[in-house]
Structures are given as structure tokens and as C-alpha cells.
Amino acid sequence: MNLQHHFLIAMPALQDPIFRRSVVYICEYNDEGAMGIIINKPLENLQVEGILEKLKIVPEPRNPEIRLDKPVMLGGPLAEDRGFILHTPPSDFSSSIRISDNTVVTTSRDVLETLGTDRQPGNVLVALGYSSWEKGQLEQEILDNAWLTAPADQNILFRTPIADRWREAAKLIGIDIVTMPGVAGHA
């Protein structure tokens, strides 16, 4: 099982305040564990333009058709002061990792400097913090019915309204998660 470029979809019974009703995009999955970014938990009162202002980044030349009022996501409970930018190619920034053919994660300032300009990647999701699991931890949580898994979908990752991402991610595997009971069993 390789969960890289997959969604983790929180089961209804998962009540942890950070992960309740969350969708986590798995950026890295290997023998040492997993790392992902929550894609449906916007930080209150923080938008991309606020991050750029705080870092004193002025988009030049500014393309007024590109919106910078998109919310910044809480990527997870770890390193909440560190930025992670999920985007579509190109991946020629100084600190980019290609996750799939059409998804890249970048942690360097140079990608932020393209936001709001014609050099910006086509699709962008900005998050602060990340989520991580040690070796075997995520697999156990899946066995314990904390998470469903589904192959990642670009539309859900970048274009589906944030409030709909949990429900839409579950639909990828044929589940209406809103009507699902809080506890599931094993067959």
C-alpha cells in the first residue's frame, strides 16, 4: 500500500479538534512514516495576501485577475509557522518535491514571490503546518477506522469549495460520509 498522492478522509467518529472532518493530502509515504497537509481547515482571518504582506513580498508585475484573497489552510499541528505550498507544475522552485505528475509541494520563498503574477502556478493551495505519522502509526489508525483513503483528485484539492471537500473526497470511493454512522466494523 502506497498512500502518496492520496487523501485521508476522517471518519465521522474521529473527534480530534484538528482532524475532525478533515481531508489530508498525503505528500510523502515511505518506510519511515507519512507526511501530509490538511486541505479543508482554513485558518481564521488569514488569507494568502496576508502571508505575502507579512513576508514583505510584493507581487511584480501584479496580475489583478489572480485572486490573493484565498484562505490559508491549517496544514496540521506540526511546525505551524512553516509554509507549505501545494501547486501544479512547474516544479523549478528551489525547494520543490514532485508528489505526482500534476502535484508539487514547495517550501521555499521563491514560489510565494510568483503569487499574484503571471508566473504563478495554475493551481495553488497555501498551508501553515503539516501532519505526520511515524512508521506503522497511520496504518494502525486506518485499521482502527479513523480514516478512509482515496486516490487524490486535483479538482477536490484545488477547486472544490473548502466546506465541501470532506464530503466530495468520500464520494470518490462511493461513500456518502454525511449519512455514515459514527462507527464502522471490519468484515
UniProtKB/Swiss-Prot annotation:
Record family assignment: Belongs to the UPF0301 (AlgH) family.
Lineage top rank: taxon: Bacteria
S-S bonds: none
UniProt protein name: UPF0301 protein KPK_0728
Annotated source species: Klebsiella pneumoniae (strain 342)
GO cellular component annotations of the record: cytosol
Entries under HAMAP family matching the protein: UPF0301 (MF_00758)
Gene3D superfamilies in the cross-refs: VC0467-like (3.40.1740.10), VC0467-like domains (3.30.70.1300)
InterPro entries in UniProt: AlgH-like (IPR003774)
